[in-house]
Regions:
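Short, acidic, metal-binding catalytic loop of nucleotide-sugar glycosyltransferases
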Residues: 27-43, 62
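Short beta-strand-to-loop element that shapes/binds the nucleotide-sugar donor at the catalytic cleft/hinge
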Residues: 169-179
């Protein structure tokens, strides 16, 4: 069994000011939620801005995991894929887009949120190209578990996550191992 590398990101895109108060999540709330799962003992690659980098490093250091934390600082998030944010903003004002929305004020209707969501794939690829990943990789949303909705005991995260992620298919005559 091999250790899994975790990859995440955090950028304050203004969710603390969302119109729908039930969907608001301030930067501090995200950091509080991260404190719960930050104790997972795996190597963690975090994409964030310089303002948040020290906070994130400090949280991981509280659990003795500073050496297993790799911070990639990006202060120009919306310039990584030039022209994408303006396109998302244009779409967000399109009447067909607006009529399609079940919750008009949902986070997924925010062009910055959509841009950041798309960047998960960009960051995973970037971490791969930088040689930061083990063979087994998991994306963890920074606000995972929303502060204890599913796992009420934060100590549930105090472990080294290892898993044999090789996929096995069993057929009546043979077994195929995909690596």
């Amino acid at each position: 069994m091999e250790e899994i590398t975790l990859v995440t990101d955090f950028f304050d895109i203004g969710r603390g000011q969302d119109k729908n108060k039930d969907l608001r999540r301030t930067a501090q709330r995200y950091f509080d939620e991260f404190k719960r799962w930050a104790r997972i003992q795996n190597t963690l690659v975090v994409y964030t801005d310089s303002d948040s980098a020290e906070i994130i490093k400090g949280i991981r250091a509280e659990y003795g995991l500073g050496e297993k934390t790799i911070i990639i600082q990006i202060d120009n998030l919306f310039e990584l894929v030039p022209g994408l944010l303006p396109k998302l903003e244009k779409i967000s004002h399109n009447k067909d887009f607006l009529n399609f929305r079940y919750l008009p004020e949902a986070s997924s209707n925010n062009p910055k949120y959509d841009y950041l969501w798309m960047m998960k794939y960009y960051f995973m690829n970037d971490a791969y190209e930088r040689g930061l990943l083990s063979e087994n990789v998991v994306w963890m949303d920074f606000g995972f578990d929303h502060g204890g909705i599913t796992y009420s005991d934060a100590e549930d995260y105090n472990f080294l996550w290892k898993y044999d992620l090789r996929i096995r298919y069993t057929f009546p005559v043979c077994m195929i191992l995909i690596q």
